[in-house]
Amino acid sequence: APVILERAGRVLLTPEKEVALGGFINGGESYVINSNPRLPWCHVLSSRQFGTLVSDMSLGFSYAFNSRELRLTPWDNDTARDNIGERLILKTSDGRFIDLIQGSTAVFSPYKAEYLFKGWGYSGSAELSVSDKGLCKRLRVKIRTDSPAELMYYTEPCLGFSRRHSSLILPEIADGVLLLSSCASEVKGWMSLSCSQK
């Protein structure tokens, strides 16, 4: 049976200066989106070698070196839909699946994207940043739940221009890290996913 994803609930923040669908906070350093835009409200975080395009409703897509040629996760050029190749999902003890980004409050600043969420039996935040050097994207999640729950990071690997050759992606696990490579990619290399808990 297909999994039904619920939306997370919003944590409303009061802007210091209201503009459009939200406003500025933290002395003008950050912009909070307090309502649902009709189209995805996008934000780019990047270094010279790596980047990610996120929105108010999704973790978007990521790329290395060139956003067209070496997409790590898929990108869709449909402005009415969002890029959903990366997601943060909470599975509750009663079997519900909640997309913690979709429906949350998005806060964008030049160096990070933060999502604040709450709902029945859970609350927390997710902070996304890109390292200045190297090819690294970090997602820090703080979450409180009333009962045991599982936190999942969903990614749809692409490793190239399009998903056309995604069946050629080879997975490997080494020292608790998921490594992915593709013989069809124009640029040879690895994509790795790892998780740590504090």
Task: State the predicted function of each range.
Residues 1-198:
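Anionic coordination/interaction segments
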